From Swiss-Prot:
Necessary cofactors: heme
Recorded family membership: Belongs to the cytochrome P450 family.
Name of this protein: Cytochrome P450 monooxygenase btcC
Membrane-related topology note: Single-pass membrane protein
Gene it is expressed from: btcC
Localization, UniProt: Membrane
Phylogenetic lineage: Eukaryota, Fungi, Dikarya, Ascomycota, Pezizomycotina
Pathway: Secondary metabolite biosynthesis; terpenoid biosynthesis
Organism of this sequence: Colletotrichum orbiculare (strain 104-T / ATCC 96160 / CBS 514.97 / LARS 414 / MAFF 240422) (Cucumber anthracnose fungus)
Pfam family of the protein (one): p450
Gene Ontology CC entries for this record: membrane
Amino acid sequence: MIFLLTLAGLKVLSIVILFGIIYLFASSIYNLYFHPLSRFPGPFLARAQDFWVSRQWISGNWPWEVEALHAKYGDIVRIGPNELSCAHPQSIKDIYGQPNINHPQFFRKFTTFYKQTDVGGSIGTEVDPHIHQGIRKRLAPGFSVSALSKQSDIVIRHIDSLLHQVSRNGQCQSGMNMSQWFMWLAFDVIVDLSFGEELGTVETGTGNDWINMLANSGFQIALGYVVRRRWKALQDLVRYCLVNEKSKSMRTKYIANAREKARQRLERGADVERFDFFSHLLREKAPEANIDFFASQGTTLVAAGTETTSTFMSALTYYLLQNPRALDRLQEELRRSFKHHSEIDGESTKSLKYLNAAIEEGMRIFAPAPFGLPRVSPGAMVSGEWIPKGSIIATAAHVTSRDERWFFKSKEFHPERWLPLDHPHYDHIFSKDRKDASKPFSIGSRSCIGIHLSYMEVRICVSKLAWSFDWEQVSAHEDFVKDARLLGLWKAAPFHVRYQPYPGAEPPVMNHSKINSDLA
């Protein structure tokens, strides 16, 4: 009897495997020769099935592999059966530039990429353009120019805490792992502005469960996207089998912690000394002033504001150290402009031409979000090609902004290309550069809401460090760019820098405030 049951089971299994093989073969033939996107070039595995995207997305090498594809196949490459990657400046405007969400040519977000769960969306994950528009409208006052002026002191306080640590530890033989310190800094800033609370990660020089979750969740994020693409119906089972108990526990604690921080922020109400992202909602007694909204938006803002800003500051530090002339010019501008580090703030750094050029060049050569932001075509022209309705398409930011056709010496770091024509360091060899090929924060109605905050934070931090210290890379073997991996977001490699105090530059005097280290 058992023998017969075993035979029956094997027979069923054989039939399932056979049908699976037939399905793969038949669908591959369709995708290769009859699919609406079959005319676009790309690797065989990418055109036939989703295997290429899945493999590259979890390998960490996505930006470099996509760059190689465009070098081989051209502006528009088929990276999946129903997915295209574009590396032309015009595609940025065509895909992301339509401001009217009701316009027939509006490209909607690709749900599978953005929506990780069935829970309500946030400013970063909501796919319905009307709901997203409402969320953005309610959050916008917290990111306005007026709000930034009130938030500047908060940002400076955390940056001064970093300077204090650098003045104490920067001269040691091993230097400081700035990938780690920049992440702690960005985390402290964004948590303070999201939940009105100082965690003091930089001040104590130690991480916590929350930031460790952010730093180590990249593979799970990448794997989650791959699973949703291919096995959406079985995603819970696959997640159960592949995600370990520690990761599940960290995620549960992360969500619980965010809700607790949201509850505490609600309890403090609008009568707080500092201005954060949710202050206006509390003052208005808005319906959005609730735990669900604060926790959902706050966790997205913390994740996005920590990873992208910190990794970019590490990359910019790396490129400046690799290009001593650029670092010298930056320091000369800063030390000529300021007599004391306390003069350096968000407003005073806006007019510094070389500083802002260096930041723009860093954004170009090492985009904070290098993956394409996938959209669903409504049936429209993109870069002169008709993209059928329902097709997935994105501009490959990392590729487009590093293309030799759009930027002279595109793989090299040259802030001079962003300088005004009358600047003494401007070089006419960059006069034909297409600046519109570099849009690190995207454009249109769904561009990054925190763009001005990010620029302000980077301006102040880089300025204070470059004004106060002379920099030295500790190890020539550390290649920050080569060693970086993309897993959901950039996973920064360790990068050690030694800092020597500049003569006459005094470190900031810290007023140690009460630090809340209870991470629920």
